[in-house]
């Protein structure tokens, strides 16, 4: 179903596949290995774009750094008027989110909360978690994951 475009693959599943085969997530997605070893600069708006669904857009901020220990993304999520179902996800490690613009309803391990611009959260990402954009405008947040 994924190969036929009937089903989207989540970024966490891409990360699992990459780990299993010993490659970076970026190498799996873009068929290009990272090459920077000392530092990697990402200019504003120039992150490696990863778009798996129309609602979620990821920009990798560390994609060109060899053997990076953390994944850092700017994530933009479009609001879905009337949507109440939050798709839940798990992956090994921990995650930090900082809301840059807009607001999100975040579900983590049985609890739901609203985070607004400037709010942040650090959590165990092995617990089921997911989110929705709240309001009429997209939410943009910094997502930092590490195992």
Predicted regions and their residues:
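Recognition helix of helix-turn-helix/homeodomain-like DNA-binding domains
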Residues: 1-9
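Short, conserved catalytic or interaction motifs in soluble domains
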Residues: 4, 30, 110
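DNA major-groove recognition helix of helix-turn-helix/homeodomain DNA-binding modules
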Residues: 12-27, 33
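Inter-domain helical "communication" segments and dimerization helices
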Residues: 22, 38-40
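Conserved short histidine dyad/triad with adjacent acidic residue
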Residues: 41-64, 72-91, 125-128
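Ligand-binding loop in jelly-roll beta-barrel domains
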Residues: 56-57, 68, 116, 125-147
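Short acidic-glycine-tyrosine-enriched beta hairpin
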Residues: 61, 109-125
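Glycine- and acidic-residue-biased ligand/ion/polar-headgroup-sensing regions
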Residues: 92-109
């Amino acid at each position: 179903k994924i190969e036929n475009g009937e089903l989207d693959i989540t970024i966490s599943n891409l990360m699992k596949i990459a780990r299993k085969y010993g490659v970076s997530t970026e190498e799996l997605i873009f068929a290009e290995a990272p090459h920077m070893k000392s530092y990697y600069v990402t200019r504003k708006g120039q992150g490696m774009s990863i778009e798996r669904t129309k609602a979620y857009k990821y920009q990798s901020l560390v994609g060109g750094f060899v053997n990076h220990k953390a994944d850092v993304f700017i994530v933009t999520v479009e609001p879905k008027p009337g949507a109440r179902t939050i798709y839940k996800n798990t992956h090994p490690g921990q995650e930090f989110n900082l809301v840059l613009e807009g607001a999100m309803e975040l579900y983590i391990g049985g609890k739901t909360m609203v985070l607004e611009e400037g709010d942040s959260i650090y959590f165990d990402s092995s617990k089921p978690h997911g989110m929705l954009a709240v309001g009429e405008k997209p939410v943009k947040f910094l997502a930092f994951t590490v195992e």
